[in-house]
């Protein structure tokens, strides 16, 4: 018997030793939009937040410690223009993600390619965020059409340069 996803199933029967109930929970990929930021999405597979490691460069200051304010990452910021952006409508990106097959012999790991703003990001591995440690990572992704991305890039490059320069000369004492 199938439930509609918002209800439950009653099993009314007399149980015998060895009886089993098998429950299949289809877990499709879906995008969850960040509240107030329509162009940023989290990738979910069922209840699991998915992410990708994007490198281990410039990690100085990014490991938390138990000191005062130790939970705040203070390493070098990376401009948004140097991060992977998912290119396509949300529907197209969702369809792409649901067409992925897990990497051979690996659970919940998917190789991504042909979906980014720059081919240099092809080969990133999407996996449960809980498995990602000691690296820079993507958990919230900018997702927009190619035309939307071109307009966004033009609009934000100058502002980002200004903010990065301000961050470089700001001292947090």
List each model region and its residues:
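C-terminal beta-rich recognition modules with glycine/proline-rich loops and embedded aromatic residues
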Residues: 2-4, 13, 20-171
């Amino acid at each position: 018997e199938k439930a509609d996803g918002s209800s439950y199933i009653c099993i009314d029967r007399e149980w015998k030793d060895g009886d089993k109930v098998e429950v299949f929970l289809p877990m499709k990929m879906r995008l969850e939009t960040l509240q107030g930021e329509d162009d940023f999405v989290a990738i979910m597979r069922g209840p699991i937040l998915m992410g990708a490691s994007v490198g281990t460069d410039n990690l100085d200051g990014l490991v938390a410690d138990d000191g005062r304010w130790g939970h705040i990452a203070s390493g070098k910021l990376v401009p948004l223009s140097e991060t992977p952006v998912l290119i396509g409508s949300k529907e197209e990106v969702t369809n792409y993600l649901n067409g992925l097959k897990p990497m051979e012999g690996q659970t919940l790991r998917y190789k991504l390619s042909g979906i980014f703003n720059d081919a240099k990001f092809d080969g990133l591995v999407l996996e449960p965020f809980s498995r990602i440690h000691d690296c820079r990572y993507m958990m919230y992704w900018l997702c927009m059409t190619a035309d939307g991305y071109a307009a966004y890039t033009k609009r934000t490059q100058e502002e980002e340069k200004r903010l990065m320069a301000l961050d470089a000369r700001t001292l947090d004492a």
